[in-house]
């Protein structure tokens, strides 16, 4: 998990700068969304006894990196989705619907799929679709369920968002790094921004820790 976090931490600023320079961000969102889906689906092959824990960690890492990097490019689209006064509302609505969707999906998997020690779900049902409780197939199905949930509820986004602005003149990897360096240098005069970035880093690390280990403690 630490390695994955470092990969995202070091690549995110560079990729973010590139996202601001290149025109069509959707192709990158498709790519990183595919990584998320592959990682989630792959977790199905994690064995209940943990004997192939390496596979589980790699699957998690692929999905996590895909999700975080796709998030960067979707953020870069915000200025083109409305005028400046609407940006906060659009961003907040996206976060809100995302958390509601996460809560609804959690209720679904706990009540219909994830088996308890007695082989029943939280409300006393057998895992649906004939999933084998003894093989923990209900719990293992959570990964594919997440992938399917993401695919289904991403369809409106991919259909409605038409992100094809013209790239900046001379937009390139080099110009992205140049913009990144200018931003870093400018932080010397933006102490409040630095404090926000540092606090946000700890906040996001805490959330990632909860996401990663919450299931272990709950089990």
Each predicted region: which residue ranges?
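Short amphipathic helix-loop junctions that connect adjacent transmembrane helices
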Residues: 1, 212-219
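Hydrophobic core of transmembrane alpha-helices in multi-pass small-molecule transporters
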Residues: 33-39, 45-46, 50-70, 202
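C-terminal membrane-cytosol helix-exit motif in multi-pass small-molecule transporters
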Residues: 105-118, 147-166
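Cytoplasmic membrane-interface "Motif A"-like loop-to-helix N-cap segments
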Residues: 19-34
């Amino acid at each position: 998990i630490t390695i994955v976090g470092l990969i995202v931490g070091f690549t995110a600023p560079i990729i973010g700068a590139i996202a601001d320079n290149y025109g069509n961000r959707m192709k990158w969102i498709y790519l990183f969304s595919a990584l998320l889906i592959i990682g989630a689906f792959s977790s199905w092959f994690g064995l209940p006894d943990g004997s192939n824990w390496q596979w589980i960690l790699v699957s998690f890492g692929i999905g996590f990196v895909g999700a975080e990097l796709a998030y960067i490019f979707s953020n870069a689209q915000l200025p083109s989705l409305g005028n400046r006064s609407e940006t906060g509302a659009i961003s907040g609505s996206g976060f809100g619907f995302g958390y509601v969707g996460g809560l609804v999906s959690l209720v679904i998997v706990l009540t219909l799929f994830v088996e308890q020690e007695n082989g029943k779900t939280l409300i006393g049902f057998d895992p649906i679709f004939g999933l084998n409780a003894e093989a923990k197939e209900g719990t293992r199905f959570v990964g594919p369920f997440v992938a399917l949930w993401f695919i289904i509820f991403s369809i409106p986004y991919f259909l409605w968002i038409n992100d094809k602005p013209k790239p900046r003149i001379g937009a390139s990897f080099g110009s992205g790094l140049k913009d990144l360096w200018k931003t870093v240098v400018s932080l010397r005069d933006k102490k409040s921004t630095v404090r926000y970035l540092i606090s946000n880093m700890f906040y996001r690390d805490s959330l990632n820790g909860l996401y990663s280990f919450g299931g272990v403690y709950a089990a």
